[in-house]
Design a protein with these regions (language model features):
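Core catalytic lobe of class I
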Residues: 2-222
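Cysteine-dependent PTP/DSP-like catalytic domain, specifically the C-terminal lobe
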Residues: 219-236
């Protein structure tokens, strides 16, 4: 196993590619996974693929669509191997407008049991093309094994305002993983294979749970490590 970039009593961060690191983790060793992968939204310039400015750094966020689908399916298959028999994957993604059409993240699921789709109501959005209505929601796909149980009072529409993380252009509010992890009854180790600035890991710490994060960009590994080193509750 590679050496952790950061490790404390409850959290571990690995710097590297998720598809290289996850196979080194033991099967059925993770309680819940909450993750939000890159959306593949970079724009091509000439003949070169581009990355989001100051964004995913090491990751090319404009892959050919079939390659992106295959990549995400492989990620989810590896996530499925890692979760316990009463575990689940919370996979945050969104429908995306492509010309006159919309693509759904359902195609990213390689046939795993999709228990439910949670609607993340962001409260606002942005659209200027005159073709599509303003998008104000995203998805959290709950992919769960048979024995995974949830809180009986949590609904499937979560009204959570987005935050502006100065450290990462594609962050999500900490309330999102907090709500998901608390909705699931499995309190085992939490994994985020796209850890970014460490929001999921920090949520796990605030819930007094162990966590593992994998991040390809060393800059964000350092930011996540600093967040985890804080002793006070993190509010995003």
């Amino acid at each position: 196993m590679i050496k952790p970039y950061y490790q404390d009593e409850h959290a571990t961060i690995y710097h590297g590619d998720s598809l290289e690191i996850m196979p080194q983790l033991a099967p059925a060793s993770i309680g819940q996974i909450f993750t939000s992968p890159p959306y593949n939204k970079g724009q091509p310039v000439g003949n070169e693929w581009t990355r989001l400015d100051n964004g995913y750094g090491e990751h090319n966020d404009n892959m050919a669509h079939p390659d992106y689908v295959a990549w995400q399916q492989n990620i989810l298959l590896e996530c499925w191997r890692l979760i316990e028999e009463n575990g689940a994957i919370w996979y945050q993604h969104k429908p995306q407008s492509k010309g006159q059409n919309v693509t759904l993240p359902l195609e990213l699921n390689p046939g795993l049991p999709l228990r439910q789709i949670v609607i993340w109501d962001r409260g606002s959005g942005f659209q200027r093309d005159g073709v599509h209505l303003v998008p104000t929601y995203e998805w959290v796909m709950l992919i769960a094994k048979n024995d995974f149980k949830v809180d009986r009072t949590t609904t499937d529409v979560w009204k959570i305002l987005p935050n502006k993380d100065p450290h990462h252009p594609a962050s999500f509010p900490i309330e999102l993983p907090l709500k998901a992890l608390q909705a699931g009854q499995n309190t085992g180790t939490v994994l985020d294979p796209f850890a970014g600035s460490g929001t999921t890991l920090r949520a796990a710490k605030d819930l007094n749970r162990n966590s593992i994060g994998i991040e390809i960009d060393k800059k964000y590994c350092e930011i996540a490590a600093n967040r985890l080193a804080q002793e006070v509750l993190d509010f995003g």
